């Protein structure tokens, strides 16, 4: 389990390593996370190291190695990661897309689509389903692809190890079915909505969190209705 700041720092270090070949300085980390002092960065680095996400190399300045990322295998850049959602994130303050994988062609490059925001979704204990359209957000058409889409504001931290944070806007493609491993909007007993990973277990359905602090829910199919699949995230800083 990672906190929001731990996740943001891990991602920042990994991106800098890929771009420049060296990790950022502590001052750069402090500025990137908008912290007042480097002591906060030291605590975050220690927490990431204790959880096995990074390794500090001895006797070398600014020597940090990323060992793994949430929902990926041991090598973040390799092909041995286990199957799962790696979110495409639109960063609201920068106005650019950071795709985890290509989600569409180039025909719609530059075009945006108004996506209705339908309320909140629990990434934690299921909350009552909300059906009220409050407003819209503009999304790149080539990120959304085909089909109908809507957005839900994430509440809770049960999917944090999949890179889905409290306060994110989840971009959902409408769908009434799912494959094992998909992250879905699941409506339970026609009254509670939750964002979880979908798996079939024999004749039952498992709704799995991506946070060890939460339990997997095993339910009969007649109690679960799929309302869409997660395809991306919109995040403001």
Curated annotation (Swiss-Prot):
<dbReference type="InterPro" id="IPR036286">
    <property type="entry name" value="LexA/Signal_pep-like_sf"/>
</dbReference>
<feature type="active site" description="For autocatalytic cleavage activity">
    <location>
        <position position="158"/>
    </location>
</feature>
<dbReference type="Pfam" id="PF01726">
    <property type="entry name" value="LexA_DNA_bind"/>
</dbReference>
<dbReference type="Pfam" id="PF00717">
    <property type="entry name" value="Peptidase_S24"/>
</dbReference>
<dbReference type="GO" id="GO:0006508">
    <property type="term" value="P:proteolysis"/>
</dbReference>
<keyword id="KW-0234">DNA repair</keyword>
<feature type="site" description="Cleavage; by autolysis">
    <location>
        <begin position="123"/>
        <end position="124"/>
    </location>
</feature>
<keyword id="KW-0378">Hydrolase</keyword>
<dbReference type="GO" id="GO:0006260">
    <property type="term" value="P:DNA replication"/>
</dbReference>
<feature type="active site" description="For autocatalytic cleavage activity">
    <location>
        <position position="196"/>
    </location>
</feature>
<dbReference type="GO" id="GO:0003677">
    <property type="term" value="F:DNA binding"/>
</dbReference>
<keyword id="KW-0227">DNA damage</keyword>
<dbReference type="GO" id="GO:0009432">
    <property type="term" value="P:SOS response"/>
</dbReference>
<dbReference type="InterPro" id="IPR039418">
    <property type="entry name" value="LexA-like"/>
</dbReference>
<dbReference type="InterPro" id="IPR036388">
    <property type="entry name" value="WH-like_DNA-bd_sf"/>
</dbReference>
<protein>
    <recommendedName>
        <fullName>LexA repressor</fullName>
        <ecNumber>3.4.21.88</ecNumber>
    </recommendedName>
</protein>
<keyword id="KW-0238">DNA-binding</keyword>
<dbReference type="InterPro" id="IPR036390">
    <property type="entry name" value="WH_DNA-bd_sf"/>
</dbReference>
<dbReference type="InterPro" id="IPR050077">
    <property type="entry name" value="LexA_repressor"/>
</dbReference>
<feature type="DNA-binding region" description="H-T-H motif">
    <location>
        <begin position="26"/>
        <end position="46"/>
    </location>
</feature>
<dbReference type="GO" id="GO:0045892">
    <property type="term" value="P:negative regulation of DNA-templated transcription"/>
</dbReference>
<comment type="subunit">
    <text>Homodimer.</text>
</comment>
<dbReference type="GO" id="GO:0006281">
    <property type="term" value="P:DNA repair"/>
</dbReference>
<dbReference type="InterPro" id="IPR006197">
    <property type="entry name" value="Peptidase_S24_LexA"/>
</dbReference>
<comment type="similarity">
    <text>Belongs to the peptidase S24 family.</text>
</comment>
<dbReference type="GO" id="GO:0004252">
    <property type="term" value="F:serine-type endopeptidase activity"/>
</dbReference>
<dbReference type="InterPro" id="IPR015927">
    <property type="entry name" value="Peptidase_S24_S26A/B/C"/>
</dbReference>
<dbReference type="InterPro" id="IPR006200">
    <property type="entry name" value="LexA"/>
</dbReference>
<keyword id="KW-0805">Transcription regulation</keyword>
<keyword id="KW-0804">Transcription</keyword>
<dbReference type="InterPro" id="IPR006199">
    <property type="entry name" value="LexA_DNA-bd_dom"/>
</dbReference>
<keyword id="KW-0742">SOS response</keyword>
<comment type="function">
    <text>Represses a number of genes involved in the response to DNA damage (SOS response), including recA and lexA. In the presence of single-stranded DNA, RecA interacts with LexA causing an autocatalytic cleavage which disrupts the DNA-binding part of LexA, leading to derepression of the SOS regulon and eventually DNA repair.</text>
</comment>
<keyword id="KW-0068">Autocatalytic cleavage</keyword>
<keyword id="KW-0235">DNA replication</keyword>
<keyword id="KW-0678">Repressor</keyword>
